[in-house]
């Protein structure tokens, strides 16, 4: 007489399904992010959702050597000076930015460059806990899969610098008729000063706040340059 197969407890079945779903989610996450180590994104989620009215959107990929040190330093100075030190999430900086929110209502530094990169490429605008949680997870995956210099290279190429203007290459040519590696400190600092809200803060019509921010970014660029900051990025 054949032995009857012992019936599996329902909780074990649900646990097995849960583990399969989690492992599948992890695998898909790495499959999405890892190719960015070698392949430039053709488009991003933010570009696909763009409602600026610009048609076609302005976007061109520029490799790291042609991006230039000035713009890299300017963006790091403006957005994430601890970029080389943290693992994608900088809780201390988030708390500090909330405490130092100025009287104009501008909130700076709430997201690291790594977070902004994965948000622009894979996600959608919004502040829901689900989106923030997914952003945090993909940021960790990006930090595992990609060197710091590659993350910064991608960010400089996909960040929006004006309505429908994506990446340093398109922004440099549109605003200055130049390639990114030929920008002056002042030009690079002005581009960086409108991040991460280029619809409200404008390069072509800078407010007093943007000009103040530009001057501060220039001073921070000079400090980072003296410290040899760029040399800290692994290729």
Residue ranges and their predicted role:
Residues 2-235:
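Juxtamembrane regions of bacterial inner-membrane/periplasmic proteins
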